[in-house]
Amino acid sequence: MRKPYTLVEILVAVSIIGILTATGLGITGYVRNKVAETQTKTTIKLIEMAFQKYNEKTGSYPVTEDKNGSDLTPFLAIEIPKDWTVNDLKWITAFNDVTLPQSTSTNPTASGLKIRGIRLEETNGSANHRKYYFLDGWGRKLICLNPGIFNSSTSYDLISFGGDKLAGDGSTKKSIRDCENEQQDIFKSQTFYPDEIGDDVTNFTRN
């Protein structure tokens, strides 16, 4: 007959299970962050390509302001009026694979914008508009500063605060919440992006 397990044996087994569980969760979290990072880099590259295509046709970069009342937030967004025409959406059509929303008598508000490879968040907007935010790999709103501050190659900055939701290593005390509450000049006092160890994803080389 097998002897019952001792208390020490039970504690050792529980400890091993706990260690394995913690290790597994850590690996899972790491993998999720890497997937989100890759998705964000892809999104930024697709946006850059579309912006460049638009610039070659018009000589300027598109206006991508997100209006929150009378304020401007730094999030990359587009508002589509229900009576839109293709000419109103020139910079969106600069993307290679776009499904544009249709406005019909049964669906009076333009909705359903899809861009292959990019996550979008659709909001109700207003009675006459539908707003879409561009999301990073973590499902958070992508930041676009236009005119930009940090990118010497283009006149705009694309920024994701990464998994920690903080700008850079957190030393600037800027977060996604700050972006929600502040105007577009959130980085106005900055001359360089203070990030060497942060998990942010940007379209410029950080110092």
What does each model-found stretch correspond to?
Residues E37, K41-N207:
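N-terminal pilin/flagellin-like segments and related low-complexity appendage regions
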Residues M1-V31, T40:
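N-terminal single-pass transmembrane signal-anchor helix
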